[in-house]
Regions:
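Active-site-proximal region of nucleotide-activated glycan assembly enzymes
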Residues: 2, 37, 56, 119-186
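Conserved nucleotide-sugar phosphate-binding/catalytic loop shared by glycosyltransferases and other
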Residues: 3-13, 33-84, 168
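Residue-level detector of alpha-helix initiation sites
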Residues: 13-14, 108-110, 134-135
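Residue-level signature of catalytic and energy-coupling elements of molecular machines
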Residues: 15, 50, 107, 150
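Short amphipathic alpha-helix
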Residues: 16-27
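An aromatic- and histidine-rich active-site surface loop
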Residues: 43-47, 100-121
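Glycine-rich, highly charged phosphate/nucleotide-binding loops
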Residues: 77-93, 184-185
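Short N-terminal targeting/anchoring amphipathic segment
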Residues: 91-110, 126-130
Length: 187
């Protein structure tokens, strides 16, 4: 059997990043030959965490839409389309080189471009979404119709996601469940 190649995309915050890492850990523990490539944002928490975790990753120059009318927010929103275009080109190169069998999106602005590239007419790569919140975020809502399955943390009824939901709970990294109480207090 060929090696399974999976892209796990998500980040911006720990709520999207750490479930992505937990999913990757679990997949590798079940099939060590699987190749996983993480995709996140240069501006998210993953920019610090991925190098520490020593995982194969790419950071996109993407940033989320800024709400509010502050000057800095308006400048960032003006630049956003250019960041999206750069992220699309970078992401296409990753897909052409890596040729993933599946893409898992854990939400947040960092997963939108990788999911968009996966689901375009040329690629048609199957996607799975993982939603940690009781109400789906924007990225989950945008890609729900194209997803093969949507793994949810909470067993809530949601009209947008009917028929595709698998109640999995929140993915938790092994270091969290197998931690030592003493070192937890220390850190």
């Amino acid at each position: 059997m060929d090696k399974l190649r999976i892209i796990i995309a998500g980040g911006g915050t720990g709520g999207h990043l750490f479930p992505a890492l937990a999913i990757g850990e679990e997949i590798i523990s079940r099939n060590p030959k699987t190749k996983i490539h993480y995709i996140g944002s240069e501006y998210g928490l993953e920019a610090k965490v991925f190098p520490i975790k020593d995982v194969w990753h790419t950071l996109l120059p993407i940033r989320g839409f800024q709400r509010g009318l502050r000057y800095n927010n308006m400048i960032r929103n003006f630049i956003l389309p250019f960041r999206i275009i750069r992220s699309i080109y970078k992401c296409k190169k990753i897909y052409n080189d890596f040729m993933p069998n599946i893409v898992i999106g854990t939400g947040g602005y960092a997963s939108a471009v990788p999911l968009l590239i996966a689901t375009n007419k040329k690629n048609k790569i199957p996607i799975i979404l993982q939603e940690q919140n009781s109400f789906p975020g924007l990225t989950t809502k945008w890609f729900a119709k194209k997803a093969k399955k949507i793994c949810v943390a909470f067993n809530e009824k949601n009209a947008d996601l009917i028929g595709k939901i698998i109640h999995t709970g929140n993915p938790i990294r092994t270091g969290i469940t197998k931690g030592v109480k003493k070192s937890g207090y220390k850190n």
